[in-house]
């Protein structure tokens, strides 16, 4: 299975990483709904899971908009793939340690704040809700939570993981983070507490 995935990464890196991201965003939301919110299968919000998968990297049915799977590689998966390539090309400092720290700093000061805003904005648009209300309510708590977890994880990722596996590594680590993002996104829309 891993060899098949490696081949897919070489042959179709953007599509492979985007679909992987979509699946794992859906897993994170399902975990939020089932393990944290304890909704049960009958009360599972399938459209919410679909929105998370769509944002993560692709159109995973059921989703209210009928778009061809191969034409939709939504937001996070494609951007993260390109972002890691840019960091690899552009941030090369005199020592390996400085290079890793520089990449983590760029990731956490540029990409993370932007992507949290893009996530909350995307969810607001897909839900038909108030963008300003969602950003005001959830942006800062989500960003602070990000900064308590991701700098260390990205330090390990940039130091030890080869470029072609960095998005996969982030995706696996993202299962818990996506659970948090899903809860953060739904604060106020239901009685979902946001803990950061």
From Swiss-Prot:
<keyword id="KW-1133">Transmembrane helix</keyword>
<keyword id="KW-0999">Mitochondrion inner membrane</keyword>
<feature type="transmembrane region" description="Helical">
    <location>
        <begin position="67"/>
        <end position="87"/>
    </location>
</feature>
<feature type="transmembrane region" description="Helical">
    <location>
        <begin position="109"/>
        <end position="129"/>
    </location>
</feature>
<dbReference type="GO" id="GO:0005737">
    <property type="term" value="C:cytoplasm"/>
</dbReference>
<feature type="transmembrane region" description="Helical">
    <location>
        <begin position="145"/>
        <end position="165"/>
    </location>
</feature>
<protein>
    <recommendedName>
        <fullName>Protein sym1</fullName>
    </recommendedName>
</protein>
<comment type="similarity">
    <text>Belongs to the peroxisomal membrane protein PXMP2/4 family.</text>
</comment>
<dbReference type="Pfam" id="PF04117">
    <property type="entry name" value="Mpv17_PMP22"/>
</dbReference>
<dbReference type="GO" id="GO:0005739">
    <property type="term" value="C:mitochondrion"/>
</dbReference>
<keyword id="KW-0812">Transmembrane</keyword>
<dbReference type="InterPro" id="IPR007248">
    <property type="entry name" value="Mpv17_PMP22"/>
</dbReference>
<comment type="function">
    <text>May be involved in cellular response to stress. Required to maintain mitochondrial DNA (mtDNA) integrity and stability.</text>
</comment>
<dbReference type="GO" id="GO:0005743">
    <property type="term" value="C:mitochondrial inner membrane"/>
</dbReference>
<keyword id="KW-0496">Mitochondrion</keyword>
<keyword id="KW-0472">Membrane</keyword>
């Amino acid at each position: 299975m891993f060899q098949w995935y490696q081949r897919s990464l070489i042959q179709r890196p953007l599509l492979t990483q985007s679909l992987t991201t979509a699946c794992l965003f859906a897993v994170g939301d399902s975990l939020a709904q089932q393990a944290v919110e304890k909704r049960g299968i009958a009360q599972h919000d399938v459209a919410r899971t679909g929105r998370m998968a769509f944002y993560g990297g692709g159109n995973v049915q059921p989703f209210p908009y009928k778009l061809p799977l191969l034409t939709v590689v939504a937001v996070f998966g494609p951007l993260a793939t390109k972002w890691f390539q840019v960091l690899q090309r552009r941030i090369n400092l005199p020592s390996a340690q400085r290079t890793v720290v520089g990449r983590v700093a760029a990731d956490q000061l540029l990409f993370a704040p932007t992507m949290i805003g893009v996530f909350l904005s995307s969810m607001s648009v897909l839900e038909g809700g108030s963008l300003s209300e969602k950003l005001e309510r959830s942006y800062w708590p989500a960003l602070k939570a990000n900064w308590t977890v991701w700098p260390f994880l990205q330090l390990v990722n940039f130091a030890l993981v080869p470029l072609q596996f960095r998005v996969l590594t982030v995706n696996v680590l993202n299962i818990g983070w996506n659970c948090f993002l899903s809860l953060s996104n739904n604060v106020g829309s239901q009685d979902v507490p946001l803990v950061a």
